[in-house]
Design a protein with these regions (language model features):
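Carbohydrate-recognition beta-sandwich/jelly-roll modules
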Residues: 1-244
Length: 244
């Protein structure tokens, strides 16, 4: 059973009576948690006055595995080209990522032998970012308003400058918080993916008929197909040749 125990300085997220995470309070703001389904809550933070900046932070216990869907899996750490590695840049600044980089908007996930925890944006159209980094207090899940990428941005094989967006001041900020007990396995993010699919899913009407889509698909593939004089054949799909 999950409970939220509030005090003046923080909200404790408790499982079977023991704290597994904590949510630091924000000055001049009130937090509320509305159950959506088992293990999932809509977290709403209302401020006394409109503001154009907010960080909604959940500090979980030390993690055995972390993930930012589509960006970082266990901290990455492979490859020879520029890549987001670990939870911080070389100068010690925690990475922050714009919502659109992640396959679930501004989503961060961590797990240990007691629980799995995820935090992400409630509205994909909100200007948000996320950060996931370890401190002595635990694993910090942060939903950031407005969108930003710090301390630098990863472009196509090179680093760019930091980015900080803007947003209209508001007095209401929303997030989705997921907490599930451990079943003893690892990489237990399937419930997160399943919920996100249901939560964000919506019907899409095909812009053209099935026959026309098939015709266009074949035409596009033929356009990309190339055969060289030495017999090599392949599809040009945006890949680049890098010498060396």
């Amino acid at each position: 059973m999950i409970e939220f125990l509030k005090s003046n300085t923080e909200t404790l997220v408790c499982m079977d009576g023991a704290a597994i995470a904590r949510i630091p309070a924000a000055a001049g703001a009130a937090d509320s948690f509305e159950a959506i389904e088992d293990g999932v809550w809509k977290w709403t933070r209302r401020t006394a006055a409109p503001t154009a900046h907010m960080r909604m932070t959940v500090i979980a216990a030390a993690a055995d595995f972390t993930m930012i869907p589509g960006i970082s899996y266990g901290g990455n750490g492979w490859g020879t080209t520029p890549e987001y590695v670990g939870d911080r840049a070389e100068d010690g600044t925690p990475w922050s990522f714009a919502s659109h980089r992640a396959t679930i908007p501004s989503c961060t996930y961590s797990e240990n032998d007691r629980a799995s925890l995820a935090l992400f944006a409630a509205d994909p159209d909100d200007s948000t970012a996320c950060s996931l980094y370890k401190t002595d207090d635990g694993e910090n899940h942060v939903l950031i308003f407005p969108e930003e990428e710090r301390p630098k941005t990863l472009q196509r094989h090179f680093w760019g400058d930091a980015f900080v967006g803007e947003m209209r001041p508001t007095d209401t900020f929303c997030a989705i918080l997921c907490v599930w007990p451990s079943d003893g396995t690892r990489h237990r993010y399937a419930p997160l993916c399943d919920f996100a699919w249901r939560f964000f899913g919506h019907p899409l009407a095909a812009p053209k008929s099935a026959r026309e889509l098939y015709r266009l698909s074949i035409a596009y593939c033929r356009y990309l197909f190339e055969r060289e004089r030495d017999g090599f054949a392949g599809f040009t799909m945006g890949a680049q040749w890098h010498l060396g």
